[in-house]
Structures are given as C-alpha cells and as structure tokens.
C-alpha cells in the first residue's frame, strides 16, 4: 500500500498583520509538510468582507517569506486545486449548498436577527444555553414553502442552515489532544452555512476547500476545537472522509499566565514589530518552533534543516506554551553573535537612521565607523534597535553623571585613577584600542589600583556608562578629543560634588 501523500494548509484571514500565534500555525504546518516531503498549501480565507484589511494578505505573505516559510500552492503560485482565495470560490460553495438543500440536509431560514435574539433571551431566562430551534417544526412541506414564499414577499433575505442529527456523537482522535468527542445537542442547533449576502460561513467553506484541495492533516490552534464538530457535521452530510485534526495548545504570557491576547500590550505580538526592532528571521523561526513543540535533547538552537529533520507532531505539547520575551531575546542574541556582519550592519544602520542619528547616505568613512560600532555592540545586543540606546554617547553630547555613576566612582581611588589615566593617554603613540589598554595597564601600575576600582571609574568617565562593549574599542570609536572632553567633564562634576 502506497504511503499517504501529506497535504497541509495554512489558511489565514487577511484581517491585519501576521500574529505570533498564526505564524506558529504556519510554521508547524510547514515543518510537518517538509519533514514528510509533502505539500504545503496557502489559502486566503477572505469570506468575512467586513473584517478584511486592504493589503492584509500581501503583508502576511511577505512576513511568512521573511520567516523562511514557503509553500507549494497558493494565490501567488497557482496549483491544481485553485482558486486559492475563498472570495473567488463562491460558485464552488453554491454547488454544495444547492446539493444539501436538494437532499433535505439544509434549508433556507428567514428568522430575522431580532427574532433570533428574542429566542436567545427567552432561553436565557429559562436557564437554557442559547441555541437555534427549528423554525418549521411540525409543518408540512407545503406549509414550509408557503412560509418561505411569504418571507420572500416581505423582502427578507434568508440564511441557509444545515440540519444537525439528533443524539449523535461527533468524535476524532486529535493529533495533539488525543480522543475528543461532542454530542450533537451541544453544538447549538442547526447552524448557518451560508450568510444572507450569499457568502459561505467559515465552518462550511473550510470543509469544501479542505476536501477539494485534498488536505490530509489540519494543524491549527486550540481555539478551533469547538469548530471541529460543526465541520464534522458538514463532512457527514456530504459523505466525505474528514482529514486528521491536530489542535495546538494556547500560547500564554509567561509573566501573567494568561492567554496571549491581541489586547495584551505587554507583549509585542506581530512579526512585523520584531522585524522593525531588528530581530533575525532565523531566530524568530527557532523561537516560535519551541512554542508548544520540543526537540529531543537539551539543545534549543537549531537551524531550519535540523528542525525539519526532527519535527514530529507527537512531540507537540498538551500544555500551554509560554511566550517568554527574555528567552526570545536570548535566542536572538545567539543568532546575532553568529550572523553575517553585513546583515547586522544593514539592520542596525536602518535603526540608527530611523532614530535620526545617521544620515540617509553616509560617507564610506562613516559607514566603516558604523560597521565597527555594530561589531563592538553585537555581543550585547538582543536585537539591533538596542544599539540606538546603547550607543547614544557616540552621537550625543555627554550628560552629567547619574547619581548611581557618581556613587560608583566616589571611592578614595576614583579621582586619582581618572587623573592618572588622562596623563597616560597623552603618552600613547596612537589612539587605538591596543594602545588605550596599555594606558589602562600603566594607570594600574602608577596607582596600584586594580580590578573594578580601576576599570569602573575609567569606563564611567570616558563612556558615561557602567556597562558596554570593550572599553578600548569604545574609546577608539569615540576618538581622543571626545574621550578627553568626557574625562574633563567628569573631573569638573566631581569637584563640584567635593569628590
């Protein structure tokens, strides 16, 4: 027996930018397809016209490509099972709507929104979960036709609802969650499969598309579990075999323990935001893959090829995945340390230009200086935009020392170390990082001060910071004139504070 050809899909709605949760769904489907040498389909689910954002699908596709996720069939690539936009498949859906109506498995419903809300209010008052009740109960076929003709005459537009069989169990063996089942009376009554404007509902269109596109596995978020029994109703009504379903766990905020919500402003949640900050796509790919999936062993840094080789949906977690910002920053820092220097330079240059610190067209000499600046900060950066704050001293006039910095250098040796270091700088032949370090060592010999009491006063006096890159490299980039100005300003402030 031939092995089943794996076909998966990622089916976003063009309602805005690419969210972390949606990126994870796309990524896991991509890894599953590539691991099994299967096919990845991109389908745009744009039937909800009110929520669609202009350019939304283009933005999402660009960000998927940036992450390193590609697909084999889709609106931009074509394929044997298109169109790949739901808005272009209306005639296809209508064919199956008509079939279900002809077979008596679906029907036109003319109940108005006001009537439906009144029904729900009545059910709530009775302590019953709101659900749709069949509006033609006890009526003959002729009576139903008469009621529908009268509704048409009033100009009412119908929806189409699908019959839900009574006392039936809908179940599936979920790839992630194991065996799940729902009773038909918990679905909420006959549900809408076509809206008043003629567009299909999500739970109908997705079944038609997945079947006709020969999708074998559906990996999606936990929030779709409640949609699955409705989709199984449609599969059963059409006599089709459903695909295998896998529902990935929620992503939660590691700080609050609550579900990651688009309203949670404590966490950046869109891929574009991380791109703008200077995160690397390989790092984002790595981090997102670990949100609800675990590789074998202790290592957490893998390239795409290694992830594809290892990916097994059996290792998808049943517990919520914690979005840990600090872990993301650590992972991105690991990639920054290994990144191509030109790539880092381009990202950091863009950040510096957006901050107004560097001209749009820097000279070759300035570019070389910026390259060195990026190199000395790369080991510290969690993302390249951090260089804007880290390296402010290189672009702005020196400010007075903070109370914390003054506290650090007001020891008995602080002033003496700074004054001696200034003398030693005048003795070095060239203002290079090597010669600067020689001046620091000469200061140590002359003062007898070493360790933190030696290095911290020098760092604070010259770079106006208690942390930073190698002190020699930093001073070389600042240049001797500015370093001496900083030292003089520090000594002046110390005198004013009687230090």
From Swiss-Prot:
<dbReference type="InterPro" id="IPR045462">
    <property type="entry name" value="aa-tRNA-synth_I_cd-bd"/>
</dbReference>
<feature type="short sequence motif" description="'KMSKS' region">
    <location>
        <begin position="259"/>
        <end position="263"/>
    </location>
</feature>
<dbReference type="GO" id="GO:0006424">
    <property type="term" value="P:glutamyl-tRNA aminoacylation"/>
</dbReference>
<protein>
    <recommendedName>
        <fullName>Glutamate--tRNA ligase</fullName>
        <ecNumber>6.1.1.17</ecNumber>
    </recommendedName>
</protein>
<dbReference type="InterPro" id="IPR001412">
    <property type="entry name" value="aa-tRNA-synth_I_CS"/>
</dbReference>
<comment type="function">
    <text>Catalyzes the attachment of glutamate to tRNA(Glu) in a two-step reaction: glutamate is first activated by ATP to form Glu-AMP and then transferred to the acceptor end of tRNA(Glu).</text>
</comment>
<dbReference type="InterPro" id="IPR014729">
    <property type="entry name" value="Rossmann-like_a/b/a_fold"/>
</dbReference>
<keyword id="KW-0963">Cytoplasm</keyword>
<keyword id="KW-0067">ATP-binding</keyword>
<comment type="subunit">
    <text>Monomer.</text>
</comment>
<dbReference type="InterPro" id="IPR008925">
    <property type="entry name" value="aa_tRNA-synth_I_cd-bd_sf"/>
</dbReference>
<dbReference type="GO" id="GO:0005524">
    <property type="term" value="F:ATP binding"/>
</dbReference>
<dbReference type="GO" id="GO:0004818">
    <property type="term" value="F:glutamate-tRNA ligase activity"/>
</dbReference>
<dbReference type="InterPro" id="IPR020751">
    <property type="entry name" value="aa-tRNA-synth_I_codon-bd_sub2"/>
</dbReference>
<dbReference type="InterPro" id="IPR049940">
    <property type="entry name" value="GluQ/Sye"/>
</dbReference>
<feature type="binding site">
    <location>
        <position position="262"/>
    </location>
    <ligand>
        <name>ATP</name>
    </ligand>
</feature>
<feature type="short sequence motif" description="'HIGH' region">
    <location>
        <begin position="12"/>
        <end position="22"/>
    </location>
</feature>
<keyword id="KW-0436">Ligase</keyword>
<dbReference type="InterPro" id="IPR020058">
    <property type="entry name" value="Glu/Gln-tRNA-synth_Ib_cat-dom"/>
</dbReference>
<keyword id="KW-0030">Aminoacyl-tRNA synthetase</keyword>
<dbReference type="GO" id="GO:0008270">
    <property type="term" value="F:zinc ion binding"/>
</dbReference>
<keyword id="KW-0547">Nucleotide-binding</keyword>
<dbReference type="Pfam" id="PF00749">
    <property type="entry name" value="tRNA-synt_1c"/>
</dbReference>
<dbReference type="GO" id="GO:0000049">
    <property type="term" value="F:tRNA binding"/>
</dbReference>
<keyword id="KW-0648">Protein biosynthesis</keyword>
<dbReference type="GO" id="GO:0005829">
    <property type="term" value="C:cytosol"/>
</dbReference>
<dbReference type="InterPro" id="IPR000924">
    <property type="entry name" value="Glu/Gln-tRNA-synth"/>
</dbReference>
<comment type="similarity">
    <text>Belongs to the class-I aminoacyl-tRNA synthetase family. Glutamate--tRNA ligase type 1 subfamily.</text>
</comment>
<dbReference type="Pfam" id="PF19269">
    <property type="entry name" value="Anticodon_2"/>
</dbReference>
<dbReference type="InterPro" id="IPR033910">
    <property type="entry name" value="GluRS_core"/>
</dbReference>
<dbReference type="InterPro" id="IPR004527">
    <property type="entry name" value="Glu-tRNA-ligase_bac/mito"/>
</dbReference>
